[in-house]
Structures are given as C-alpha cells and as structure tokens.
C-alpha cells in the first residue's frame, strides 16, 4: 500500500542537539521487552502477575470526561488484578513535554505514541522492540501494526485504538432536490458529474452558494490516499518529499479539478470551522469525516437526518484514512514487566471493549470489534469496515513540512 521510509530528525521536532541527547539516552532499541523483563523486576518470588505493590507510570494526553472515565476504569482493574499502582502522567503539550522527559531520562514506563509521530520517536531509540507473538499482534489489523513497525521490521508499539473516515450524507437535503443515498457514486471517477448536478439543483432550490454539495479538508491527513495512489509514496528513501512525479501530479489534478469546479469546498469557504459544523448546520450535503463526528451529530445537531456509507473507490481501490495511537515501552524503564503487562491488558479484547466503548473510537483488532458488536450500529459498522483498507496517517519525520507544501499548492 505504501513504502515505509524513515529519516533522522527534521525541523518537525526538536533541534539537533536535543535529538542527540534523546538518542544517547534511548539505549539499545534492539533489546526486546521479553528479554529484559526479568532484569527490571524487583518482585522476585512473587506470583505471576503480582507486582507486590510497585508502581508503573503511564504517559497519556488529556481527554474528555468519557475518555478519562475509561482510562480510570482500566487503571482500577489493572491495579486490582496485579497488586500494584498505576500512575497516569497526563501531558498537556504531549510531544514537547515527553521529549523533555526523554532528554531528562524521566519518561514514563509506557506511553502513547501517535502513528503520525512514530517515525520520529522510532529514530530516537527511546522505545523497546516488542515481540509480535507475545502481544498477539496477529489478531490486529495488519495496516495498523505496520504503522508502528520500523524500517528494519521491528514492532515498537501496540495499537490501542483507531478512527477512520467515512462518507456522511444529509438525507433530507438529498431528497429535497430529487436524489437518494443510492445516487451517491461509489467511485470517485463519477463524483464530478454527480456533484456538479447536485450543486446546480441546490443552487436552484436554495439560492446560489447557500448550500455546498460537498465539503473537504485541505489537508494531507484526509487526502493522502488519493495523492499516493499508484506511487511508491510521497517521500523517498531519505525522507525527502516526492511531489512532482507524473502520478502524484495526476492525482493532485483530480483534487484540483473538483475544487476548481466548485463542487468541493472547505468549511472555511462557507465561513465555518470544520466539517461537523458545516454538516450539522445544513450547509453541506456530503462530507468525508471521522467517527468522532458521530457523537457531535447526535448531541449538538440531533435534528439532522443523516446516513453513512463507505468511502468511494479511487482508481479501482477501496481506501480510507485511519488515525491510530499505540503504546510503547520506554527503553530505560525499570518496570518493563509491568509496562508489558499493562499493554497486554489494555489491548486485550476486554481492555479494548472498556476503552473504545467509553472513548468513542474503534478497536484495532477484529475480534474486539465483534465483542463490542459494532455491527449493530450502522454508523460504527461502516467506520469499522473501513479499518482494514485504511491508510494510517503517517508520512515520515517531515510530515508537517510536506503537509504545508501540499496546503500551499491548493487554492
């Protein structure tokens, strides 16, 4: 699906001096957690899983009330099952603060890593290599595991959740101009003709530029699968952007064609902040959005009659984007046995059911999705179906630079 490329530190993160300090404190990342567990344990002779009142520190970023309740439930269960304490270290500026902790050699035993940042942190050597069999990674969606696999094929994080894009449509607005959900094409090749017709009908009924046929995000995190289709990726082996190849330009032209035709508009074009607001206020008929918008629509825009369908095919391939976060183990942790046990629990079917049900995200493994009965909710069912074919949001260590270049290219 894509070529994995990693490079050393770039302007995305800290200065060269900080990177050197981080690399120096990272230790040998070839040391597996399984091999180092015995050395890190101070509970000799204790029963398996009994950590004798020790404390494991878990680095996370803050969330909403539902996420806080879910992580606290996991904490409570783990403490009860393992006779230990879990200290949740909540960062308010995650990437800045945890890098400072790496430099100071005070990082948590186990911590969140966003897939978009994994190439950077992997290059620093601050995480242990994990044994796929030990963490049951065969049960996880392969594309999500790949997002946390380094250039040498070593897995360094276990996915803890995911979100995907799907196509949302306003049923009432469609029907008001003579369309139904079945008329929305399943192939991007048919989008321009359909959206042009839809926009013309909307303008005739509601007035010019009152309601958009479709909104999109001017961001690679949403459009990467289109630009990257049929290529070896948007970065070369050295991590430099490759945005001028014929296929990339052709894919870019496809997006520009929809924008120039006036059938793809950004929420800001409508004077609004994001897709959810544009859709919820009835200012757009169709949007491609992540499952996080579902709660917003149910709570803040409950009068909107909407449906959800899979993302359209592009050049014969079914795509979506996914946004995943994993747990990594600090290479210098003195509690690797506890960190490992924490990951195994929170990424088990039981742990994921607690976390994903509470936090409103998708489980990274199919058996957990089945246990959660995501198929019983038509919205969650579509988003879950998109997981296996999704492209995780990740683009080497120069992600922000490449994304800015892309945004500057679009009108």
Show where each model-derived region lies.
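Short, low-complexity disordered leader/linker segments with a strong preference
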Residues: 1-57, 367
